[in-house]
């Protein structure tokens, strides 16, 4: 089945349609490549671009070198220094089904003078990551600059911004001549969700998708702002390749990995077009579990000599093709809109949808963000809407189908008062969010207490939604500090388990008083401060008193934070209500463990890689190693000193065996640290088992 174009809808005058379509595609190109603000979904753009190519194929007299489907990328930004790529950075042509994939192979065979039905091709299969393309230029092994793709010939220098990304080598030993390393900079789905959660709290603009986030972060003039976005990269190609001992694309990937560049674990070596189609089908099934957004696979002819022989069109290689994932959009009905109140007082609208199965799971709700979002989409109860999973995970309403709107559907009236306490709601000028300003609002108290005892904060077991509701309803507590004043008698009167259950809860509360400092910092619920930033603050200041005394400048200087977070933390800790809460927590005996601030150099010169399911969060282990002078990278190379492997370690373990890199389990790491005078570090910080400390997922 062919991918649907729009040729059947074309007007009688093909030139008029061509000119209109050319302008439309060019407009979308500028929005996507130059403004990082796409105006339509990728699949809609693909349909428009395909129709334009079909018109140019049918009417060659229409096309010229300035056609938006014959050029690459967009104009470089004047805000950054331009640089000419030694070899052009191209785009990729697309296919959308197995028939088109076989057609592409026939064209490839024809360009190489081979039989059209040949099945002798070997391919590499790679994921098509939805990020921003970059080019890293090395001369005699030294990184000279990093640049965006730009228009394919001239890009924008973003070296300082790229160097905030983990594992980008600045020096390659023993390499002479010129080398270009190409890849994709991306924002992980988890960091995308965290950014938007903070943006919703602050009322600042949301990112439309992770690709937008990556592009915007990489184009920040201040690299410290880029650092706070936690960008990552996957490198997958070379342009100029002096000194690279590779005859195939697969050998290029292996060489990049050996040099320490981050590469994809999902790439595969494939024999024949049937294997390529099977790889694509497997990636479709797996793509909801990827760390990053991917909108397809890329299939490349493996032989570099055959690549050179096949050559390029004006915009794309003939020897590679992007096989796009199908986009599943489902029609459903917007049954109702409710407005909830979060712990910051934000009024958060939620869409309730007729349940539909999308990509293997039932979807019945979707976030609507704020009043402007509802108004801009003109969403009305009763509307038929198209829903997809953003990034394969988060349900998102894409658009309304106005021709199916009921006659009596009225615009949604956003509440002017808090739906819980009735207090008049407020919306500051320039803020996208509406808030309940009542600090005593039961909904806010409920959410703040739930967050305080949650697993990523103080981790107090046994205090669930029902108990928090009862405690607030009975007037036994008003905030988190009140939890530490509860008696066994009060709890026994509420809990079905009576005295035994009450005793367990009081024991959990008592144990939480001396948990690590970062847990309390996170539990306070400050804007922009989640688990990772709480750990950074704890490491930087050591004690709660140290953090309370810190200046905005000192907080801003903490690696990975920056000015916006510093302002938010300073304002939160200066708030009288926050100071009162902290004082009452301390009066109740909450005295978190101090963090070790002093850096040492016992591990100086050692490079570590972490892999597999570890009993403690990987970020915690990484912080310990770096605090002692070690370096933690993401790829096993000949420079790696130790691979620390948990359960279900994958390809990194095999790679360590190939290179002769020593492998340590967690007991071995603890022994190494003890030998170096760093004490016993093999037990979780708060004495919990791995299952209770949010163990890091397996990573191959």
Swiss-Prot record:
Keywords: DNA damage, DNA repair, DNA replication, Ligase, Manganese, Metal-binding, NAD, Zinc. Gene3D superfamilies: 5' to 3' exonuclease, C-terminal subdomain (1.10.150.20), 6.20.10.30, BRCT domain (3.40.50.10190), DNA ligase/mRNA capping enzyme (3.30.470.30), Helix hairpin bin (1.10.287.610), Nucleic acid-binding proteins (2.40.50.140). Its EC number is 6.5.1.2. PROSITE patterns: BRCT (PS50172). The active site is at 128 (n6-amp-lysine intermediate). It is an enzyme of class 6 (ligase). CDD domains: BRCT_DNA_ligase_like (cd17748), LIGANc (cd00114). Pfam families: BRCT, DNA_ligase_aden, DNA_ligase_OB, DNA_ligase_ZBD, HHH_2, HHH_5, Nlig-Ia. Residues 598-686 form the BRCT domain. InterPro entries: BRCT_dom (IPR001357), BRCT_dom_sf (IPR036420), DisA/LigA_HHH (IPR041663), DNA_ligase (IPR001679), DNAligase_adenylation (IPR013839), DNAligase_N (IPR013840), NA-bd_OB-fold (IPR012340), NAD_DNA_ligase_OB (IPR004150). Its cofactor is Mn(2+). NAD(+) binds at residues 42-46, 91-92, 126, 149, 184, 300, 324. GO terms for biological process: DNA repair; DNA replication. GO terms for molecular function: DNA ligase (NAD+) activity; metal ion binding. One of its GO terms (cellular component) is cytosol. It catalyses: NAD(+) + (deoxyribonucleotide)n-3'-hydroxyl + 5'-phospho-(deoxyribonucleotide)m = (deoxyribonucleotide)n+m + AMP + beta-nicotinamide D-nucleotide. It comes from the Bacteria. NCBIfam families: dnlj (TIGR00575), PRK07956.1 (NF005932). DNA ligase that catalyzes the formation of phosphodiester linkages between 5'-phosphoryl and 3'-hydroxyl groups in double-stranded DNA using NAD as a coenzyme and as the energy source for the reaction. It is essential for DNA replication and repair of damaged DNA. Belongs to the NAD-dependent DNA ligase family. LigA subfamily. PANTHER family: CHROMOSOME TRANSMISSION FIDELITY FACTOR 18, DNA LIGASE. This is DNA ligase. The lineage of its organism: Bacteria, Thermotogati, Deinococcota, Deinococci, Deinococcales.
